[in-house]
């Protein structure tokens, strides 16, 4: 009897794992070609607002690659992940630097790539549990295998959070500057990129001195990367 239960348990576990793998691969393949009008983080924010009793309206409008400002594409890469065209989802150089700084006494800083952030924002939730990190790694591998780099950045720019209830570049451009996503200047794009580490607390339209300095640094990095020509490497 015990062996039968063990055999059934192992069989169930095997089928559950195969089902998860199949479903996750299918989801990633679907989102390779289908516009993304929602994400797990958006759903999480709606649930949070319902629990807190503070309603929030989600603003998000999908824009295809050619309707997204090159300035914004480059600013986000310059700010978040300068090795984005080269790595395969994980930047081990940045991970090592973050660990070295931590061992030296600094606070542990993030080293997530744009690919990792896309996986987390689209498919997962925002806590820092090991379960979530493991699933993030799995989905990162899948999107790196099944999507071109251009698609990863396109989805990221359309779903990333830029303020309370504001998701995606089009909504952020309208919210902060009153322009469409394809009309963002280098200065505006750099400010949007500068607030990404803490978008619900920082503002691109009313920047602190820190955000001003960070956006200036991002613009310098954009020039050093080679401007829009850098995007041809994607």
From Swiss-Prot:
Organism annotation: Chromohalobacter salexigens (strain ATCC BAA-138 / DSM 3043 / CIP 106854 / NCIMB 13768 / 1H11)
The record's function comment reads: Peptidoglycan polymerase that catalyzes glycan chain elongation from lipid-linked precursors.
Subcellular localization, as worded in the UniProt entry: Cell inner membrane
* InterPro entries in alphabetical order: Glyco_trans_51, Lysozyme-like_dom_sf, PBP_transglycosylase, Pep_trsgly
Q: What pathway does this protein act in?
A: Cell wall biogenesis; peptidoglycan biosynthesis
Kindly state a single biological-process term from the GO annotations of this entry. regulation of cell shape
PANTHER family recorded for this chain?
Answer: BIOSYNTHETIC PEPTIDOGLYCAN TRANSGLYCOSYLASE, MONOFUNCTIONAL BIOSYNTHETIC PEPTIDOGLYCAN TRANSGLYCOSYLASE
The UniProt GO MF terms for this protein read: pentosyltransferase activity; peptidoglycan glycosyltransferase activity
> Which family does the similarity line name?
Belongs to the glycosyltransferase 51 family.
Tell me what reaction this enzyme catalyses: [GlcNAc-(1->4)-Mur2Ac(oyl-L-Ala-gamma-D-Glu-L-Lys-D-Ala-D-Ala)](n)-di-trans,octa-cis-undecaprenyl diphosphate + beta-D-GlcNAc-(1->4)-Mur2Ac(oyl-L-Ala-gamma-D-Glu-L-Lys-D-Ala-D-Ala)-di-trans,octa-cis-undecaprenyl diphosphate = [GlcNAc-(1->4)-Mur2Ac(oyl-L-Ala-gamma-D-Glu-L-Lys-D-Ala-D-Ala)](n+1)-di-trans,octa-cis-undecaprenyl diphosphate + di-trans,octa-cis-undecaprenyl diphosphate + H(+)
What is the name listed in the Swiss-Prot or TrEMBL entry for this protein? Biosynthetic peptidoglycan transglycosylase
Q: Which SUPFAM superfamilies match?
A: Lysozyme-like
Keywords from UniProt, A to Z, are: Cell inner membrane, Cell membrane, Cell shape, Cell wall biogenesis/degradation, Glycosyltransferase, Membrane, Peptidoglycan synthesis, Transferase, Transmembrane, Transmembrane helix
Keyword Phosphoprotein listed: no
Transmembrane region positions? 11-31
């Amino acid at each position: 009897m015990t062996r039968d239960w063990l055999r059934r348990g192992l069989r169930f576990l095997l089928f559950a794992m195969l089902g998860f793998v199949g479903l996750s691969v299918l989801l990633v393949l679907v989102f390779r070609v289908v516009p993304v009008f929602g994400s797990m983080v958006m759903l999480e924010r709606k649930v949070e607002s319902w629990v807190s009793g503070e309603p929030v309206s989600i603003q998000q409008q999908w824009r295809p690659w050619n309707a997204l400002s090159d300035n914004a594409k480059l600013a986000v890469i310059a700010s978040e992940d300068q090795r984005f065209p080269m790595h395969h989802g994980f930047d081990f150089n940045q991970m090592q630097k973050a660990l070295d700084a931590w061992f030296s006494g600094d606070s542990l800083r993030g080293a997530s790539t744009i690919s990792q952030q896309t996986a987390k924002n689209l498919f997962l939730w925002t806590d820092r549990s090991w379960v979530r990190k493991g699933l993030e790694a799995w989905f990162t591998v899948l999107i790196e295998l099944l999507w071109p780099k251009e698609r990863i950045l396109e989805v990221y720019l359309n779903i990333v959070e830029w303020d309370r209830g504001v998701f995606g570049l089009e909504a952020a451009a309208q919210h902060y500057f009153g322009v469409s996503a394809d009309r963002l200047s280098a200065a505006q794009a750099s400010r949007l990129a500068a607030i990404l580490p803490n978008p619900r607390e920082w503002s691109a339209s009313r920047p602190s001195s820190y955000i001003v300095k960070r956006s200036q640094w991002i613009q310098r990095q954009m020039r050093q990367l080679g401007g829009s020509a850098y995007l041809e490497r994607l």
